[in-house]
Each structure stands twice: as C-alpha cells, then as structure tokens.
Amino acid sequence: MLPPRQQPRPGGLQTSLSLVSPDACGSPNPQERGSTSDQARDSPSESASSRETWPTSDALMLKKLEKEKENGYTEHSVVRNISNSDKMSLRDIARERVDVIAERMRNLPDEYLEKFKHELRVILEGLGGAQHREEFLFLQRLVNSRGDLTDGTLIITHRTQLEILVAIKTGIQAFLHPSVSLSQASLIDIFLYKRCRNIACGSMLPAEECSCEICAKKNGFCNLCMCVICYKFDFEVNSCRWIGCDLCSHWTHTDCAISNGQIGTGPSVKNGASSAETLFRCHACSRTSELLGWVKDVFQHCAPSWDAEAFVRELDYVRRIFQRSEDARGRKLFWKCEELIEKLKNGVADPMACKVILSFFQELDVDPSKSQDNDEGGRLIAPEEAFNKIADVVQEAIRKMEAVAEEKMRMVKKARLALDACDQELKDKAREVTSLKMERQRKKQQIDELESIVRLKQAEADMFDLKAGEARREAERLQRIALAKTEKSEEDYASRYLKQRLSEAEAEKQYLFEKIKLQESSRASQSSAGGNDPSQMMYSKIQDLIKNM
C-alpha cells in the first residue's frame, strides 16, 4: 500500500495540533484508560500515573463523582449551582450544568470568552510543567465523569463552551484556534466519539464502516489516519513513516511497528518457490504484508519530490525496517540505505541519490532467483555438473563473505571516521580550554586592575574627605571670625552713631539755650517796661527743662 491519504497538509495548524491517543483523551471506560496510560507523551493530555496528586480544593468533589459513577447514577451527579461570584473559570465550565454556563456565556463579551480559550491553550501547551499537566488532567476527569453530556444537552451549548469541552476531552488545542471553524454538529460528533478528531480527516466513525475489533471497541479510533498501536495521528504523507496493511488497509507508524516487534523475517511463496522475506504483521488483522515492494512503490511515487533532509529521513526509516532482515535482498537494501545516507551527509545531490536508489530497486527486480532443478530429481549428477554446482556454492559463499567483509569495512570506516571526529573534537575542546584559560587570566588581570583602581579611588575619596573636613573647619572658623567682626563693627557703628547723636543733641541744646537766653534778654527788657506776662512763665519752664536735659 502507498502512504496514507495523499491530502494537503492544513496550513497554519501544524504547531497547534498534537498527537493524542483516545485513551489519553479520556475514554469513558476506566479500564481502557488504565490499560494504555503510558502511550500518550506528546501533549498535556497524556494519562496520569498512579502517583499523580489532584488539587486539594476539588479533591472531595472528584472522589464524590467517582463514587457515584461506580454506583451507577452519574447522570444526576452534576452540580446544580454556580458560585454567586461574577467570575467564571475553566473548572466551572467543565463541572457545571450546560444550560447555566451557556446562559452566562451569552451575557459575557467576546474578549472575556477569548480569555478562557487562551487560558486552556496555555494549559494544553504544557509550558507550566507538572502544574499545567495536573490541572488539565483534573479538568479532563471532571468532563469524563459527567453523564449529562449527550446530544440533547450539547446542542444548547454556547459555541465557546462546546469548543472548550471538546478541547478538554481530546487534548487537542486546534479546536481553540481562531482559524478553525467546525460546525456545532461536527464538534458534538467529535466529543461523542462519532467523528474522527483529526481535523484534516473528519471521517464518521467507524471509518468505512469497519467492523474489526479495534474499530469496534476503541472509542475515537479512525483507521484512515490513526496508528493501530499508539492510536495517534499526524500529517506525514508521501512517507515511509506509515506502513499500511495490504489486506485490511489499517495503518501503523513505522516506529511503533519496529518497537512492537511487528516487523521480521518470514517465509514467502512466489512463483511456487518458498523464500525468506522481511514481512510486516498487522496488529489489527494479524496478517502479513511484504515490505520490500511497499518501500519500492513509496520511493518510485514519492522520492522525486523529497529534499535532501526528507530523503535522509526516509532512508533512515528503511534502514531501521531492514536492520534485522535475514534475507539477501533485505540485507542489500539495508547496506544501500546506509551507503546513501553517508553520501547524502557528505554532500551528494539528492537527485543523484534518487536515481541510485531507483536503479537499485530495478536491479533487485531483475536479479535472477535460484532455480530448482525439479526435472533432475532421481538421476545421478555428472562429475562436471557437480563441480559446477560446488563452484556455484563456493562463489555464493565468497560473495556472502565479500559482502560481510564490505560491511565490516564500512563499519571500520565509520568507526575510524567517528574516532577522527572524536580526536578533532578533543583538539577543538583543548583549544577551547586554552582559550578559556587565557580569557580567565585576562579577566583576572582586569579584575586586579579594577581592584587597584578601586583602591586608588578609595584613597582619593578618603583624601578628599579629609580635605573637605579641613575646609569645613576652616569655613566654620572664618564664619566665627566674620561673625565676631560683624558684631564688633555693629557695636562701633552704634557707639559712633550714639556719639554723633549726642553731639548733635548738645549742639541743638546749645543752640536752644542761646536762643532762649536771647529771648530772655529781649523779654527782660520788655518786662521792665510792662508787668508779668504768661509767655514769660512758659519760657522759664522751657529753660528749666533744657537744664534738666
């Protein structure tokens, strides 16, 4: 079979789609979840171990839900009331009644609803480590333990509410991506395991009405895009990463088939002759498919479109498939893949490698098979013919020995190259160590210089501090001197001012005295002519007052 589904890869979603198995997404059957708890490792939806601890704030609620589920009445175990707070959390969406949450979401702005989706995307990315993983597992357990999430109740959900519930159940954050717009019916089908959760597939389940045991019993499994061993899907097409069963058309990851022992050497009958070939045993139907022809078909149809990196990756897949092959053609293909990988790593153009591998497949097709001489049975073989057959056997043994020798030489060459690479790496590391030592010495010298500069600056600071103290004391002394001189000058000024005022007062006194005397003399002359006058009495009082001054 050719690689699965030659469909274009959906643009813009590769980073937001994770590989998740149905078990990791939370199967309604607790036994199913426990049986494959170690299979999902690519997203926070991986199953928790028995040592996981749940958040204590909701531990009692979780135990109650589990107990009611065991007793068979989980349909009525949904919490009926939401807290009176205006805030709503992802736990409320996962736990509370559908109609109540839907009604509240219709009254919330779109920006607030986007916050829920962003918060869940952050949890699904798992960047918060164990805390985010535990939070997601707790949300998933809440959703999976509910019995009221049916077609009838999910049809009334708010769009954002339904997207969050589907993302929690599947563990795929693509359902929260702004560019992904699935219908409400499709989201409900995905939630109820009626439709493939792979957005690029979207087939109704069971796909193609398959009635095999895996499709019938494994919830959410799609045989068109999922591996029958790990139950995961991806967007790899035109690749040897997937192996398809020729009989039941189910697909398996090459890595899963190798690790699960589904690839080995077995008998194959072609043209009436029995020979050993590398076979793939399907995990779904337990029947075998031949791998060499499948690899040839993949390379013939898809190799011309591969770049060098993809070509090396595909050759590595083929190399690991035929690594333990015991048939001659499988061993030749294994050696050829190793040879081409080495050449591509050394810079050989990928179109040339494509031509080489395709011509190699043609050589394998025209390689004559061993013929069986059925018509010679029962008769004696001539000596010359016996010698020829012995020679053929010897030639075949020599060819095998040469092939083994070539393989050993290649291994020795690879070991020598690895040794040379190690020696070169040691030399590089030695140079790096020398450089680091020199750098360390230089840094040490710089540190010493900086320390000496710091000490010098500290000494300068101490000196400046000392000078500042002396200057401060000198300023205080000068201030005291200036203050004393100011006080003395003020006293001198006051003394001179008082003396000046006193001399002025004396002069004025003398002037008034002279004036009074003059007036007295004039009045005396007048009084001799006339009697006492009231003004004479006033002058006498003024004279007494001046004398007192």
Swiss-Prot record:
Q: Which organism is it from?
A: Nicotiana benthamiana
> Which ranges are annotated Polar residues under compositional bias?
28-38, 45-56, 521-538
Superkingdom, natural source? Eukaryota
Keyword set for this entry?
Answer: Coiled coil, Developmental protein, Host-virus interaction, Metal-binding, Nucleus, Zinc, Zinc-finger
User: Which interval of the chain is the signal sequence?
Assistant: none
Please tell me where this protein is predominantly located: nucleus
UniProt region (Disordered), positions on chain: 1-56, 519-549
InterPro entries of this UniProt entry? OBE1-like_PHD, OBERON, Oberon-like_PHD, Oberon_cc, Znf_PHD
Q: Which residues form a coiled coil?
A: 394-520
Give the UniProt subcellular location, in the record's own words.
Answer: Nucleus
Query: Any idea what this protein is called?
Result: OBERON-like protein
For biological process, the GO terms are:
maintenance of root meristem identity; maintenance of shoot apical meristem identity; regulation of gene expression; root meristem specification; transport of virus in host, cell to cell
One cellular component term (GO) for this entry is:
nucleus
Q: Identify one Pfam family in the record.
A: Oberon_cc
